[in-house]
């Protein structure tokens, strides 16, 4: 796709997103705000493939294959006072166990940043973008946004909230970043196939990195480094996330691979990112403070 915006490395951009099909929009008389562009998109933009509504792509001048795009997630805000969650037969982590489709509309309180679940529970909101990615390699052809891959995409990592940084390998000139699939809250795994799906606005700073070499997404929070494994086999995901963390530790500290492997066993946290996107995800977290002491 041609870029909708071209920026310089280091620039900040505010990106508005929407989510959901016509069947997910609540009735007009329920007091829920629906961004007008969601109606426009469904009227004017037929879907090319199953997947998400994304905003982008954003081109970064001078971005070349082999570089890394650093995305600082500076702020995330809710754009509407509701979200939705569904069970879809033959989807999710237990695809044959729940055979009745179900959809719930979830009221969101933007002042208290809580969600009111229909069975009486109140959940804190911690919004993030489920999909953040650059253009995949051209030789992959046209692909759906549903499966995450080396270019990022539908990562669904709940750690990627405001104040964190995502690093993506660049495969095409301009990088061509897009995002969407806003989540108000999600558990590790996203087991029933959806989170609290909602419209978000994000403020990002994009920077080109020539001093990094990545083949899969990587991230960091103020306190932790995060490595990822993305594959249809969850065991392979685990191996890749662990191997990537070992490589990160040895690069940042000079520890041997054996010492780094042992440190991962003693202090690293392996977590299930998601189990529902075809390609599954595992991520490993390691405290930055430990690596500072080991350097």
Regions found by a protein language model. Give the residues of each.
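Short, Lys/Arg- and Gly-enriched loop/turn segments at beta-strand edges
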Residues: 20-32, 76-86, 174-184, 273-275
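N-terminal, Lys/Arg-enriched amphipathic/low-complexity engagement segments
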Residues: 1-46
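Conserved mixed alpha/beta catalytic, RNA-binding, or beta-rich assembly cores of soluble enzyme
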Residues: 125-235
